[in-house]
């Protein structure tokens, strides 16, 4: 009993002393979840990937150089490069202390998950990846506010970005262009979100061994959300909904909602078929998208929203059986070239509703979007906010102007439009404790700019470290 009394007294004394030793100028953390602006900033990833945390709380790796060199002694990536950070293991966050274009020497593949790449941390104009693709084959991954502009200089027949057979991946505010194959292809994934991305100018008559391409992407998955993206200047696959030849396990449902599609050439959105012995036709919500033909759109397809497929020799070669059409919930889409298609979306489909449609929206197993706009509202939101838009470069600015003004064309090489623009860096804001949060922001929200550990603490918003809250708050106006 005496020991219990002594221990209690000592505990009380320590608490009093600790309180007395707090310096009067040290800020006290506010009660969690009391700032509605910060709470709202943490809710901007929507749909299938809404609960993905990436590398939050993990080791911070700073990208301080723009080369892609290996150590001459070990052959391993040099510290300070993007590849070095990506190739680490464990939970990790990649931030940038410089801006500019990184000309890769080979593909950049994320093979180990629990990683967040925070392009919005780059001072100045931001980061661009060039020459080789970004490939994601891992789970629990967030990539945001990065440009991936492939080009044909490396003679690589590649997508700009591909995500396959992964769980829990978020692509947020990316700007992707100049691919030789598809620009962005994402299929076979579960709990996936691609949002606010600009996918533009895949190369049509380029170096691909199969000849003419110029494709937007192959999109699919299970609990996969594609919303508020811009597809512009692609000949076809705007997008191509995936099929059993590339994946048999993830057959939907998916949300294709609030996207803008501009200046398709030979085909707009299509596909989604499957085999009776495989995954079967895909389950797709095709809702409130905005389609606008452009100068390169063929007259025969200028009023086409979607071309659901009912045949696929590749599917039956792989799986056998017979081919079934997708089941599409098709409603609320705007076709600027046709009031009748806007009024009745099924008149903009190559197949009837009885063949490829459903009366009810797919909801089972699909994380709903918390904010859904009309097609016309989404048009303005996407053109204003999509892409690597914290600092829009000349490429995205031109693409958005093309959409607004009905200009532009399909291209064959990036040199037709000037190639990669120069991205300028700038001075970083003061971060005395080197925790990733500027002193000014920490002071504003009751943190201690001299405490290097409060970035990993969770005191502002439930479920998010303070550093994650800062990084989401930084871009809060771009959603």
Q: Which residues does each predicted region cover?
A:
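Right-handed parallel beta-helix
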Residues: 114, 119, 139-150, 165-178, ...
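Extracellular beta-strand-rich, repetitive "passenger/adhesive" scaffolds
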Residues: 120-127, 146, 174, 450-454
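Acidic Gly/Asp/Thr-rich repetitive segments characteristic of extracellular carbohydrate-active
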Residues: 40-94
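Extracellular calcium-associated, cysteine-rich motifs in secreted modular proteins
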Residues: 416-479
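Extracellular beta-rich repeat passengers
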Residues: 240, 250-415
């Amino acid at each position: 009993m005496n020991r219990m009394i002594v221990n209690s007294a000592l505990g009380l004394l320590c608490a009093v002393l600790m309180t007395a030793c707090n310096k009067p100028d040290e800020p006290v953390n506010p009660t969690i979840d009391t700032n509605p602006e910060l709470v709202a900033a943490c809710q901007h990833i929507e749909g299938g990937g809404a609960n993905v945390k990436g590398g939050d709380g993990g080791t911070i790796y700073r990208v301080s150089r723009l080369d892609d060199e290996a150590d001459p002694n070990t052959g391993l990536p040099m510290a300070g490069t993007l590849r070095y950070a990506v190739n680490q293991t464990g939970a990790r966050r990649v931030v940038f202390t410089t801006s500019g274009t990184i000309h890769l020497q080979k593909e950049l593949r994320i093979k180990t998950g629990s990683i967040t790449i925070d392009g919005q941390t780059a001072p100045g104009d931001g980061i661009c990846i060039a020459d080789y693709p970004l490939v994601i084959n891992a789970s629990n991954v967030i990539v945001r506010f990065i440009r991936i502009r492939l080009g044909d200089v490396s003679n690589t027949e590649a997508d700009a970005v591909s995500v396959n057979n992964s769980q829990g991946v978020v692509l947020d505010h990316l700007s992707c262009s100049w691919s030789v194959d598809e620009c962005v292809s994402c299929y076979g994934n579960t709990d996936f979100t691609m949002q606010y991305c600009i996918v533009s100018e895949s190369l049509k008559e380029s170096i691909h061994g199969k000849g003419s391409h110029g494709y937007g992407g192959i999109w699919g998955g299970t609990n996969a959300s594609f919303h508020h993206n811009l597809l512009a200047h692609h000949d076809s696959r705007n997008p191509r909904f995936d099929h059993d030849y590339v994946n048999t396990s993830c057959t939907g449902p998916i949300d294709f909602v609030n996207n803008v599609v501009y200046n398709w050439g030979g085909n707009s959105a299509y596909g989604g078929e499957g085999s009776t012995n495989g995954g079967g036709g895909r389950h797709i919500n095709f809702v409130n998208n905005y389609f606008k033909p452009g100068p390169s759109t063929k007259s025969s397809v200028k009023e086409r929203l979607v071309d659901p497929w009912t045949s696929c020799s590749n599917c039956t070669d792989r799986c056998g059986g017979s081919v079934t059409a997708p089941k599409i919930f098709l409603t609320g889409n705007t076709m600027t070239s046709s009031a009748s298609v806007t009024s009745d979306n099924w008149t903009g489909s190559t197949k009837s509703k009885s063949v490829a449609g459903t009366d009810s929206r797919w909801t089972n197993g699909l994380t709903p979007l918390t904010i859904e706009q009309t097609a016309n509202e989404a048009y303005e939101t996407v053109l204003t906010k999509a892409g690597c838009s914290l600092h829009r470069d000349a490429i995205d600015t031109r693409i958005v102007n093309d959409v607004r003004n009905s200009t532009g064309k399909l291209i064959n090489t990036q040199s037709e439009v000037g190639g990669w623009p120069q991205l300028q860096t700038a001075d970083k804001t003061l971060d005395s404790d080197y925790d990733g949060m500027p002193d000014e922001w920490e002071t504003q929200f009751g943190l201690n700019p001299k405490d290097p550990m409060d970035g990993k603490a969770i005191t502002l918003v439930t479920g998010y470290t303070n550093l994650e809250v800062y990084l989401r708050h930084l871009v809060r106006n771009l959603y």
